[in-house]
UniProtKB/Swiss-Prot annotation:
GO annotation, biological process: protein secretion by the type III secretion system
Protein name: Type 3 secretion system needle filament protein
Major localization class: secreted
Function: Component of the type III secretion system (T3SS), also called injectisome, which is used to inject bacterial effector proteins into eukaryotic host cells. YscF/SctF forms the external needle filament that protrudes from the bacterial surface. The needle is not sufficient by itself for the formation of a pore allowing translocation of the Yop effectors across the host cell membrane.
Length: 87
């Protein structure tokens, strides 16, 4: 399971830049894993173990990017709601 070190109990993240920075490393790691899995398939594209590894890497990448997108959208909505309440 991925460890999002910025999202631990008692650790406040106050702005969107901090959220993006916290999610950058897991996203980069997932992207590298997908690229490495694709590179491993170049020699033996019909290897079931390598295909399963690629599928796992893509699923992990997808989950991390969905989490990132959801968090950024939530922060945007929160900030937009706060700004709309100002006169």
């Amino acid at each position: 399971m991925s460890n999002f070190s910025g999202f631990t109990k008692g650790n406040d993240i106050a702005d969107l830049d901090a959220v993006a920075q916290t999610l950058k490393k897991p996203a980069d790691d997932a992207n590298k894993a997908v690229n490495d899995s694709i590179a491993a398939l170049k020699d033996t594209p019909d290897n079931p173990a390598l295909l399963a590894d690629l599928q796992h890497s893509i699923n992990k990448w997808s989950v991390i990017y969905n989490i990132s997108s959801t968090i950024v959208r939530s922060m945007k909505d929160l900030m937009q709601g706060i700004l709309q309440k100002f006169p």
